[in-house]
Design a protein with these regions (language model features):
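A structural motif
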Residues: 1-14
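C-terminal active-site subregion of NodB/CE4 polysaccharide deacetylases
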Residues: 8, 21-135
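Active-site-proximal loop/turn and secondary-structure-junction residues that shape catalytic pockets
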Residues: 13-17, 54
Length: 135
């Protein structure tokens, strides 16, 4: 139903593990479970959103090595990581797209409000009666 309404679905890993800190064997085991348990329900997806604020490489450079080869073997061509500097970015590489996303959470809104300047006014989002938001 969601796809019929124009939504594009993505993988967030099977077990919510950080692929940056994981070895290829652990990533492959996670992807095998995704393919076995989730793909029959959702269908194939080509977008991977890295869990745990993780990425398989630092910075915005092109990926290389065993991890990107493994992810591409499982059909992924779009990779979305987390930007902790407050600005999103997109990098189009040979055969895949890499993007850094800006996460909107209570913590980022409370402690990094400058990240959202020009997007929305963070002062209107947090309820002061709820107390401090942990960092």
């Amino acid at each position: 139903v969601l796809r019929n309404d124009g939504y594009e679905l993505a993988c967030y890993t099977y077990a919510n593990i950080g692929y940056g800190e994981s070895g290829t064997a652990e990533i492959e085991a996670d992807l095998a479970l995704w393919k076995e348990e989730v793909v029959p329900i959702l269908g194939e997806v080509d977008t991977l959103v890295f869990a745990q604020n993780s990425d398989i490489d630092d910075g915005t450079a092109a990926y290389y090595g065993d991890k990107i080869a493994l992810l591409q073997k499982y059909g992924f061509a779009k990779f979305i990581g987390f930007c902790d500097e407050g600005s999103s970015w997109v990098s189009l590489n040979d055969g895949y797209l890499r993007q850094g996303r800006l996460m909107v959470t209570g913590s980022t809104v409370a402690h990094n409000s400058e990240w959202f300047t020009g997007i929305f006014d963070t002062a209107n989002l947090l309820d002061p009666s709820r107390g401090d938001v942990p960092a």
